[in-house]
From Swiss-Prot:
Domain of life: Bacteria
Single GO MF annotation: structural constituent of ribosome
Subunit relationships: Part of the ribosomal stalk of the 50S ribosomal subunit. The N-terminus interacts with L11 and the large rRNA to form the base of the stalk. The C-terminus forms an elongated spine to which L12 dimers bind in a sequential fashion forming a multimeric L10(L12)X complex.
Protein name, UniProt field: Large ribosomal subunit protein uL10
Chain's role: Forms part of the ribosomal stalk, playing a central role in the interaction of the ribosome with GTP-bound translation factors.
Protein's organism: Gluconacetobacter diazotrophicus (strain ATCC 49037 / DSM 5601 / CCUG 37298 / CIP 103539 / LMG 7603 / PAl5)
RNA-binding recorded as keyword: yes
Cited Gene3D superfamilies: 3.30.70.1730, 6.10.250.290
């Protein structure tokens, strides 16, 4: 029996190393991480939260703080390590606004989910910073607005360029009618 528990511990250590490595890889690729306290969150509420986070293209993960701190070490998100105390969860996304919006909205309706802070790139954010980020339009909305701003001058230029040609055509048409009448 003693050999069996040693094998299980080795397996646990291997699983933990793999988890830390996968979390570190996520931190290397993502642009935003938010830390929340989920003390007392029911399974049903957690399931709803996960679904909303997933629908926004983000991830919500409850992780052991010690393992999360190991994964954060040496990354640009290292500044959020002090937030990892007690029952916490990490959320991340490539679109920083999406994950912040979902978590802020859910925290408004469920007091068991408490925002602790986060990080956007190398910038550590407090709770107010995460809430301010949630107020911004999403990345897709900003892209659409930018395309609209870029295309508006082009359509105006095309309209201006076409106007003289139309005026010339009307002038030539008037001369042609005048010559036919004469």
């Amino acid at each position: 029996m003693p050999g069996r528990s040693r094998r299980r511990r080795e397996l646990d250590r291997t699983e933990k190393r793999e988890f830390v490595a996968s979390l570190a890889a996520v931190f290397a690729e993502t642009s935003m991480v938010v830390v929340t306290r989920n003390d007392g969150l029911t399974v049903a509420d957690a399931t709803i939260l996960r679904q909303r986070v997933r629908a926004a293209g983000a991830t919500y993960k409850v992780a052991k703080n010690r393992l999360a701190n190991l994964a954060l070490a040496g990354t640009r998100f290292e500044g959020i390590s002090p937030l990892l105390k007690g029952p916490t969860a990490l959320s991340w996304s490539a679109d920083p606004v999406a994950v912040a919006k979902v978590l802020v909205e859910f925290a408004k309706t469920n007091e068991k989910l408490v925002l602790l802070g986060g990080a956007l790139g190398t910038q550590t954010l407090n709770v107010d910073g995460v809430k301010a980020l949630a107020e911004l339009p999403s990345l897709d909305t900003l892209r659409a607005q930018l395309v609209g701003l870029i295309s508006t001058p082009a359509t105006r230029i095309a309209g201006v360029l076409q106007a003289p040609a139309g005026q010339l055509a009307r002038v030539f048409g008037a001369y042609a009618k005048k010559d036919e009448a004469a």
